Amino acid sequence: MLTSFKSSSSSSEDATATTTENPPPLCIASSSAATSASHHLRRLLFTAANFVSQSNFTAAQNLLSILSLNSSPHGDSTERLVHLFTKALSVRINRQQQDQTAETVATWTTNEMTMSNSTVFTSSVCKEQFLFRTKNNNSDFESCYYLWLNQLTPFIRFGHLTANQAILDATETNDNGALHILDLDISQGLQWPPLMQALAERSSNPSSPPPSLRITGCGRDVTGLNRTGDRLTRFADSLGLQFQFHTLVIVEEDLAGLLLQIRLLALSAVQGETIAVNCVHFLHKIFNDDGDMIGHFLSAIKSLNSRIVTMAEREANHGDHSFLNRFSEAVDHYMAIFDSLEATLPPNSRERLTLEQRWFGKEILDVVAAEETERKQRHRRFEIWEEMMKRFGFVNVPIGSFALSQAKLLLRLHYPSEGYNLQFLNNSLFLGWQNRPLFSVSSWK
């Protein structure tokens, strides 16, 4: 795909050189031309990205003006995708032109949802719509979007249920029933109620003591962690499950502190307690360019001698050093996600609009506009994680057949679209849309 737009860059540059300040929208002759128009929008988008990579900002901004007029958060999946990538490219241009510092993170402004489709993303508009700052990510809104993502798509549930089943399978012969889960990104704890219920039902003898569960939940917000612990404690009480919850606050960028906490956890392990480590949508956050951070982290996890390590990650290569490679990968990945949302949610769904603009839009902004240590979305494909895990002494534990059946049931009952598919490959389970894998879950020991 990159080859095709590179080959046409010279002609595109000639075309954009004469573009007026307020170019007319692209004309679509009939509905039968929609597919052709979508391909044309994508081709223009890649051409604009190529200009940005060459620091040809004038040509890029001319194309982005055209794209902003012909894309919309309310259009079809291609138009909605192009709308977000156009804005992200505009932000990247602004930052390169203004030589802004890279010690910040991306967030959306509150008025982003009401922005006019016809807005041309000049530098001043981009500065209003996107802010790069270090704090105030509005965790309450983030929590709301996360809940919507969990309810409206199978992505989160697929990872949670499959990882849970791997933990249950690995601890089925646990003699004393004492299980300690280290959850490295617990968020709101949505993963654990189904597992807690399964553990409570394991005791077939009413006279035997109920199983024991201890969860150490990691996160950056101590208030949010305490709320999660309170909810899980109340749920455990309703099941008669012996339960303890401990918080482990992770200070952003403080990997050394996290490693110390993990090693202290290994030293304080209760005798006879089975340890499970849950890395669901976490490892990509600490994958730096040279890989040393993830290496230190995996070594620390290995020192816990856990029964099982569960991992769920995106099937995308958003950590590539090359901006153009990363851009191309991101367009294909999010195109599949947007197509899946369009097929499973109503055309005027407010929830879909919010998820695309606020959740996935923020990710797209990070992948496209951020560089070096500032970029948080460093997803890697399964083969990269597989090689990394094996390098540090982990052995792949096959995902069981029941987990596959459970995932099929999840899709059939809650997301009945023919576009979703499951694939069992390399002892791991993949969720995809059409022919593109989107998420993978694997387990290790």
Swiss-Prot record:
Membrane-crossing residue ranges in chain numbering: none
Summarize what gene deletion causes.
Plants fail to initiate axillary meristems and do not form lateral shoots during vegetative development.
The molecular function terms in GO held by this entry are: DNA-binding transcription factor activity
Q: What keywords appear on the UniProt entry?
A: Nucleus, Transcription, Transcription regulation
Annotated segments matching region VHIID? 146-217
Q: Where in the cell is it found?
A: Nucleus
Write out the ranges of the annotated region (Leucine repeat II (LRII)).
227-259
Q: Name one Pfam family in it.
A: GRAS
Quote the PROSITE patterns the UniProt record gives.
GRAS
Instruction: Tell me the tissue specificity.
Output: Expressed in roots and flowers.
Q: For the region Leucine repeat I (LRI), give the residue spans.
A: 39-127
Matching InterPro entries, A to Z? TF_GRAS (IPR005202)
Question: Motif VHIID in this chain: where?
Answer: 179-183
The record's principal subcellular location, in a coarse class, is: nucleus
Q: Which PANTHER family match?
A: OSJNBA0084A10.13 PROTEIN-RELATED
Report the family membership.
Belongs to the GRAS family.
Question: What task does this protein carry out?
Answer: Probable transcription factor required for axillary (lateral) shoot meristem formation during vegetative development. Seems to act upstream of REVOLUTA.
Protein known as: Scarecrow-like protein 18
This protein's species is: Arabidopsis thaliana (Mouse-ear cress)
Record gene name: SCL18
